């Protein structure tokens, strides 16, 4: 069976995006390289990789609505929600029937991130 290798998203500022994901989740760079004019960093998101691509002239979040979100199980859910509050990042908390919550917010480039208190 095939498995997920990585999810790639465009960002406006690679360095700021790397800092954002490191400060919130502790995600670390596992590889960085260039491809033509694009600067690319791969970050370990625990069980997969998120590819951040900074390419001159490319929009960050897709304007056509074909992109939904990336969902992450976060064992430090409450801590991360508190960090979002500290940074003034707007969020939407959604209570689940299993006694846990989901939290939706946007990264620096408008990509929607969902954090899950418990796995499904």
Predicted features and spans:
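Core segments of cupin and vicinal oxygen chelate
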Residues: 2, 9-50
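Mid-chain, well-packed structural core segment of small domains
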Residues: 67-81
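Vicinal oxygen chelate
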Residues: 30, 42, 81-120
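N-terminal beta-strand motif that seeds the catalytic metal site of vicinal oxygen chelate
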Residues: 1-15, 68-72, 119
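Residue-level marker for the onset of beta-strands and adjacent loop->beta junctions
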Residues: 5, 38-39, 68, 99-101
């Amino acid at each position: 069976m095939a498995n997920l290798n990585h999810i790639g998203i465009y960002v406006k500022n690679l360095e700021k995006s790397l800092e954002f994901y490191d400060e919130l989740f502790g995600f670390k760079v596992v590889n960085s390289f260039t491809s033509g004019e694009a600067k690319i960093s791969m970050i370990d998101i625990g069980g997969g990789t998120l590819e951040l691509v900074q390419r001159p002239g490319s929009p960050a979040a897709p304007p056509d609505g074909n992109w939904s979100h990336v969902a992450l199980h976060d064992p430090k859910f409450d801590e991360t929600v508190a960090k979002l509050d500290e940074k003034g990042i707007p969020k939407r908390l959604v209570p689940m029937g299993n006694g846990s919550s989901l939290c939706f917010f946007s990264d620096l480039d408008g990509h929607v991130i969902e954090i899950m208190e418990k796995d499904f």
